[in-house]
Amino acid sequence: MTGLLSQAILLVDGYNVIGAWPELIQLRDTQGLDIARSQLAETLANYSAYKGFETLLVFDAYGQPQTHRSEKFTQHLSIHYTSFGQTADSYIEISCAKFRNDIRKFEKRLIVATSDRTQRLTVVGYGAEWMSATQLGSDVNLSVQKVKHRQKPQKRSKQRFLSKSLNPETQAKLAKLRLNLMD
């Protein structure tokens, strides 16, 4: 976990989310698991940057004989692949147990995103917050809408001068100021 100044640490069970979001299920089934993983990483990178979260996206080793590895995807997102034989669930549980004794718990929230009921009970027992994969998807979509709304261009006045876009009362006050008629 990095030392970013974030308001929360978000742990995401990657395959659980892929299996819960309709658009990722479709990608997985039509284009493959790698494409679905990449899309999830891109989506979470944007979401994490918007929310100011430090996000750890966790994937099981998926039967691959490998040791744990992690890669920094962006400033806000790192991707963790568990060791052979370790599940994302156990990786997340260990992270929650460590966080429970970490001084950062007084400064940051720890949120776990998974729809696994047993996992939910365990992480809440460690003091973490929980959200389902569906809730995460809804929050991601809401964040995307907020960003789009912010980026909408302001309606520009068709008038050549700024004063023409002002209401009549303000225009009158400006005219008086210009003519030194104000008290």
Enumerate the predicted regions with their spans.
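Nuclease catalytic cores that cleave nucleic-acid phosphodiester bonds
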Residues: 2-9, 16-183
